[in-house]
Amino acid sequence: MDELFHVSERKSTIGTELRAGLTSFLAMAYIIAVNPAVLSGAGIDAGALACATCLGAGIMTICMGIFANRPLACASGLGVNAMIAGITTTVCGGDWHVAMSVIFLEGVVILLLVLCGLREAIMDAIPVVLRHAISVGLGLFIAMIGLCDAGIITAGAGTLVGLGDITSPTFIVGIISILVTVALACRNVPGSLLIGIVVAVIAGIPLGVTQAPTGIIAPLDFSSIGGPIADAGGVPAIVKVLTDPALLVISFSLLMSDFFDTMGTAMAVAKQGEFLTDDGNVENIKEILIVDSAAAAVGGFMGVSSITTFVESTSGAADGGRTGLTSVTAGVLFILAAFFSPIVTIVSSAATCGALVYVGYLMMSEASEIDWSDVSQGFPAFMIVAGVPFTYSISAGIGLGFIAYVIVALFKGEASKIKPLMWIAALAFLVYFFVA
């Protein structure tokens, strides 16, 4: 196993990789309960969704570990699932098979773009300063997710955001999670992120945040699988998507989101996992992008929305994960969760707050690599750093930075220095913003 995953070569140990895989899994486990809750509104059986969510995440995370050998984990993406639930009733005539076919088509197209080298080429064309900014923006985004999930940050009364109710049980569990994680990290205790999650889960029991499981074993239900080939008015659902302009526009919008979300996530995890080169390139990026693109199509076929590389993967990398063994461990746990999902869902999102906030802190170090005194570098970087958390969208934040970079270069008379693919990406984002 050491030789297969190059564990010793990357200055890690099998024990560290297994622990990091468990940390990633626990940081992502909330999706097992949340994804069915969101998509069941589209008419899909919740039990089938829980089963397929676990299996889809498990299979594609294992694939990521084996083929890319990097500590990234995959699962159904939030945001996209809510959009799919919405278009099922508004655009797809209540037929969720058609909605999942939109995801399937988007995944296939992205996979083709990766195989022909376009996605990797665009990533290589991103200026180094924007790569640093993406890591910082992702750090703030991850911290925002953790703080919001724990109710520490909430919608304010008369303001966009505000401090949550400090007497709320979820607030208290979130604070405990942060304090334990930081205290252990200060003492360089191995597995501080994982311990922080476990302590918070235990602390949540008397506070009523950690709910007792409704059972132990969940029956397997595969009825959500096969949406694109299901009948939709006399034709396969995928055919209906290909012949409907409105659905094709939605597929393009999802494609842009997936296209750049994974780029940002890969850079963030690469920084924590120490596989980001000095010039800002992600090692094994082609393999990562191939698996991620295939995962989107697999998610559509399994009826669980787009499966994508999870930004919470940074928690496993921050906990010492350096190889694909971390991913394989998380993937196996997801597959086991298909049988024991009632137990897994006791891990509340508030319990993972400390891990996410601490990872966000670690990623802020990239800000020192940006020359803030140069407006042509600092302003586009700032648009990404501010845009990602404030729009609550990785792709939207990256798009704002790309467009700002091109505009500032035009103002300075340095348009000739911009690589052609950056022009294409900026124009694509303009179209995306109008379409979305």
Task: Give the ranges of each region predicted by the language model.
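Internal alpha-helical transmembrane segments of multi-pass membrane proteins, especially GPCRs
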Residues: C51, S101-F104, F252, I290, ...
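Helix-loop-helix junctions within the multi-pass membrane cores of secondary transporters/permeases
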Residues: M1-N35, G56, S76-G86, T90-L138, ...
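Helix-loop-helix hairpins and the membrane-proximal interhelical loops
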Residues: M1-A48, V161-L163, I195-K286, L430-V431
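Conserved, well-structured core segments that form the ligand-binding/active-site neighborhood
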Residues: P71, V201, I205, G320
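Transmembrane alpha-helix interface/packing and boundary motifs in multi-pass membrane proteins
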Residues: M60-L72, V182-N188, S253-D261, D292-M302, ...
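Membrane-embedded alpha-helical modules
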Residues: C92-P206, T210, V328-A436
